[in-house]
């Protein structure tokens, strides 16, 4: 893994950084140690805002929750952008 984040409820989010031909993922680990796919990079840009390319294989990095635990922020290494993800977190293991 590239980095990880402890969620407000004590679970983990693990960011992949591998050299495989698969899209990079964020993997969750619940309080019992079970892992599950949480998010997968699916970023392909066709010139929007000046960026073109297939970025599915670029790593997630710098994942963290807002202070109130309502928003998860994650960065995509290339082309370099941040996403904000909201729950409902209480409905799942994170």
Where are these regions (language model features)?
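Sequence/structural signature of beta-propeller domains
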Residues: 1-94
């Amino acid at each position: 893994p590239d980095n990880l984040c402890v969620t407000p409820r004590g679970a983990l989010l693990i960011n992949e950084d591998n050299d495989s031909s698969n899209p990079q993922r964020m993997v969750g680990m619940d309080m019992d140690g079970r892992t599950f796919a949480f998010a997968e990079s699916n970023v392909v840009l066709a010139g929007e805002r000046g960026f073109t390319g297939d970025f599915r294989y670029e790593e997630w990095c710098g994942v963290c929750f807002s202070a109130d635990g309502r928003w998860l922020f994650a960065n995509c290494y290339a082309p370099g952008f941040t996403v904000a993800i909201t729950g409902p977190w209480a409905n799942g293991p994170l």
